[in-house]
Amino acid sequence: MNRPTMRNTAAVTTDYDREQLRRELNSLRRSVHELCTRSATGFDCNRFLEAGDRAPAVIVKAAANGGQHSSLICDKV
C-alpha cells in the first residue's frame, strides 16, 4: 500500500484492547485529579495543563486488522 509520508514524521503502530485503554485513561484521570487537589504535593496543574497546548499534534488512524485487537497508526505532525 502506498501511503503519503511527510519528512521527519514519527509513525507508531500499536495493538490495544479498548477496555484496557479505557481503564488506564480513567486511572490516569484519577491520578491527575488527586495530584491537583492535594496541596502538599506542590504539583502545578496550570503548568501541566498548559503544556498540552504546546504538545505536537498526533493523527490517529485505524489500520485494517482481522484480529480481536485494533491496530492504530499514530502520525506525529
Curated annotation (Swiss-Prot):
InterPro entries: AcMNPV_Orf5
Lineage summary: Viruses, Viruses incertae sedis, Naldaviricetes, Lefavirales, Baculoviridae
Annotated organism of origin: Orgyia pseudotsugata multicapsid polyhedrosis virus
Taxonomic superkingdom: Viruses
Pfam families for this protein: DUF2576
Protein's recorded name: Uncharacterized 8.6 kDa protein
